[in-house]
Amino acid sequence: MKTELSLLDRSLNLQRYPKRAQELLQAWDAGDEYIIKYVEEELNLEDGKNILILNDNFGALSCWFSDKHNVTMMTDSFVSQRGTLKNLQRNQCNRVQLITSTEEMPQGFDLVLMQIPKNNRMLTWQLQQLRQSMDSSCPIIAVNKAKEIHSSTLELFEDYLGETKTSLAWKKHRLVFSNANASNPKTIAEAVCWSVDNEDIDLLNYPNVYSGEKLDQGARFMLEHIPSDPELRHIIDLGCGNGVLSVKAGQLNPEARITCVDESFMAVESARRNLEVNLGKERQFQFIANNCLDGFKKHSSYLVLCNPPFHQGQAITDHIAWQMFCDAKHILCKDGKLLVIGNRHLDYDGKLCRLFGEENVTTVASNSKFVILEAVKAEKSK
């Protein structure tokens, strides 16, 4: 896979995070290149400008513009943040301020660059924050694949931010130009709250959390099959999202210590709030933004709950699920269990059989769309 971004007589060595031996995906896309070309060739910025970059996937924009400008990068992704840091170090770039989506959006910028997020609610929230934080004279330039920029996308920019126009397509990407000058902008609440039908669970979701306004079908199915066992002293919810599986696990296992892990900072904060509200602040909880289970101790958990994502940013991939399964096996105690839910077509059973052994993988439940699998760590497993 290509790792050298060469553009305008400059080059950067950019790699995805975590680094894999046989990486199939590139650490930047044509959208990054389009923004770089436009800013360098059309804006003629003086050195030392203050630039805010939103949703930089693996730091291509941050690395490029930190050469001559003061860059702040804001993201909801732990993986993107860590990947950006690694690429900054790899290319010996100037210091970039890295902040998370759960922090207040800073002010005082001369230019804002944005990779448009996949989640429309996250986009709307970021546009509202830009409208409230940026001066009307500050150019805001966003990018996405042309096929993903619809009239409804531009309406969001107009409604929540200000006057908006688009560029011609280049390498199947399009730029969106806007300013924070809407005279009467629409507003959106930071969080959505609702109660889970037929469960004693109240949930709050911050903008970038999956299934923002209702419980997704997979999670609902999984709730019916979370075990209750006094031997489950430590339960990990891997890819926790809003923490609904952790809440149910905590209700069924009141003595268990629960750890919620997700790569989304907003997901981790949603889970923190939801466990404290539904289970009480006095319980033993841990909330970690992380790349899967990096840094977790071996043989430290009795049950891992997992609802793996099959995309990373805009890219569809199954390597995240595989890493989750490998990490879960590593940290499970002997006879510990990994409980996984996924769409039937994703072949998680094949992956789990390869990893845990066919005799240690069983189907707990299935319906027309989902399957729940249990993998047990046998005594001989490492």
From Swiss-Prot:
Location relative to the cell: Cytoplasm
InterPro entries in the cross-refs: rRNA_m2G-MeTrfase_RlmG (IPR017237), RsmC/RlmG (IPR046977), SAM-dependent_MTases_sf (IPR029063), Small_mtfrase_dom (IPR007848)
Source domain of life: Bacteria
Gene3D superfamilies: Vaccinia Virus protein VP39
Single GO molecular function: 23S rRNA (guanine(1835)-N(2))-methyltransferase activity
Keyword match Transit peptide: no
Signal peptide residues on this chain, from the entry's feature table: none
Pfam families registered for this protein in UniProt: MTS (PF05175)
Catalysed reaction, written as an equation: guanosine(1835) in 23S rRNA + S-adenosyl-L-methionine = N(2)-methylguanosine(1835) in 23S rRNA + S-adenosyl-L-homocysteine + H(+)
EC number(s) on file: 2.1.1.174
Record's keyword annotation contains Cytoplasm: yes
Keywords linked to the UniProt accession: Cytoplasm, Methyltransferase, rRNA processing, S-adenosyl-L-methionine, Transferase
Function statement: Specifically methylates the guanine in position 1835 (m2G1835) of 23S rRNA.
Family membership: Belongs to the methyltransferase superfamily. RlmG family.
Protein name: Ribosomal RNA large subunit methyltransferase G
Naturally occurring in which organism (per UniProt): Aliivibrio fischeri (strain MJ11)
Gene label: rlmG
